């Protein structure tokens, strides 16, 4: 049974010396406005499994296989892509993550 981690508010957290988001097959982090890193809404799913990563990419992208020789909608799926602006906003906050976590702990 694969483990899916709900790591919504766990950016930077550790358990028994390992970072949260590294235990399961998938880990979901939230970017909603009250979280450690925010883009207003949305989230990030992390995995180190190439097959799952491909399935996730297709799922959040209406199952449209961009870059495939014959792109098609492979299965019914929504559009959950972050915008490029949301991605840039999230990336700009990463260097400040340790400070944000420390401030929340105080």
Segments the model singles out, each with a brief description of its role:
Residues 6:
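Glycine-centered flexible beta-alpha turn that most often forms the glycine-rich phosphate-binding loop
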Residues 10-16, 23-106:
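Active-site region of PLP-dependent enzymes
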């Amino acid at each position: 049974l694969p483990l899916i981690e709900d790591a919504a508010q766990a950016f930077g957290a550790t358990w028994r010396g390992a970072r949260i988001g590294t235990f399961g097959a998938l880990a979901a982090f939230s970017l909603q406005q009250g979280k450690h890193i925010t883009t207003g809404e949305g989230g990030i799913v992390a995995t180190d499994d190439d097959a799952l990563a491909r399935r996730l990419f297709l799922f959040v992208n209406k199952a449209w296989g961009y870059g495939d020789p014959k792109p098609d909608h492979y299965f019914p799926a929504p559009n959950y892509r972050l915008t490029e602006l949301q991605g840039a906003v999230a990336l700009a906050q990463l260097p400040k993550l340790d400070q944000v976590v420390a401030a929340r702990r105080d």
